[in-house]
């Protein structure tokens, strides 16, 4: 039986990776019970630096992110990456190209990478991305890259 959304608040604020991923998944899926939990979590947000990176395909975004994450980690700071990928025309999910190019970062305990599909949202930003940033901010990451 899945953990109720309201029971994810404390583990998320404690930086529990599984709870963070579950809450982001529920936000992406549009679960109606997320709003109350997000409102509580939002009170703890506002400490992270958030940087958005955009560009045409093949312009080096993933390479830049990978290099930037390495540099920030050498300073001992934690980093979360929200990789917004185009949606697959077949599944509606993320194509995951960015995540594949950043595989060496996934085993670093100071790095959290989450891919999100645009799911048809205009402007290339998934609808749940801003909520994901708030969740990651409240969970204690120093830097969040989108």
Give the predicted meaning of each segment:
Residues 3-15, 21-48, 59, 65-146:
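Nucleotide-state-sensitive switch-loop elements of NTP-binding domains
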Residues 51-53:
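Hydrophobic anchor at the beta1->P-loop junction of P-loop NTPases
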């Amino acid at each position: 039986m899945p953990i109720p959304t309201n029971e994810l608040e404390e583990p998320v604020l404690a930086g529990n990776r599984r709870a963070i991923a579950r809450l982001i998944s529920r936000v992406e899926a549009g679960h109606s019970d997320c709003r109350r939990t997000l409102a509580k979590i939002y009170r703890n947000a506002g400490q992270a630096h958030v940087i958005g990176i955009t560009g045409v395909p093949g312009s080096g975004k993933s390479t830049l992110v990978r290099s930037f994450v390495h540099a920030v980690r050498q300073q001992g700071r934690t980093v979360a990456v929200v990789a917004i990928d185009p949606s697959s025309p077949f599944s509606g999910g993320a194509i995951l190209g960015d995540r594949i190019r950043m595989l060496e970062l996934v085993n670093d305990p100071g790095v959290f990478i989450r891919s999100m599909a645009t799911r048809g949202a205009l402007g290339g930003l998934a609808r749940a991305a801003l909520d994901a940033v708030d969740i990651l901010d409240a969970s204690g990451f120093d830097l969040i890259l989108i």
